[in-house]
């Protein structure tokens, strides 16, 4: 305890610093999709194409949001683990990219009327 009562024999300096800088929002990417199933391949494809055209009509005019259609797949559905084709399934994805999280979030909410969310990140 002797050191507590002795005066300091050196100068003591406290330093602190801070900096602040506004940075741009991170890039937000969302992928949505439509998937349809039915007996006739042409009918399934038409429903997928109609849903994607609707989504693109809404998404393309959105300021600051880049849109891109992704893979389009059509494949058979088999009955009860057999080799007999019982129908068809088709799927197409839509990629949205931008820095305005609020605008992308609102667009996703609207698009969920006909598309499902695959990922947001």
Where are these regions (language model features)?
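Short, charged, surface-exposed interaction patches
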Residues: 2-121
């Amino acid at each position: 305890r002797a050191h507590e009562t002795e005066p300091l024999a050196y100068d003591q300096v406290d330093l602190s610093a801070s900096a602040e800088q506004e940075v741009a929002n991170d890039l937000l990417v969302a992928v949505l999709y439509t998937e349809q199933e039915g007996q006739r391949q042409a009918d399934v494809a038409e429903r997928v194409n109609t849903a994607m055209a609707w989504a693109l009509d809404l998404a393309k005019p959105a300021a600051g949001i880049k849109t891109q259609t992704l893979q389009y797949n059509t494949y058979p559905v088999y009955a009860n683990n057999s080799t007999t084709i019982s129908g068809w399934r088709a799927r197409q994805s839509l990629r949205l990219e931008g820095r305005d999280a609020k605008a992308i979030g609102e667009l996703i909410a609207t698009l969920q009327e006909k598309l499902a969310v695959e990922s947001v990140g």
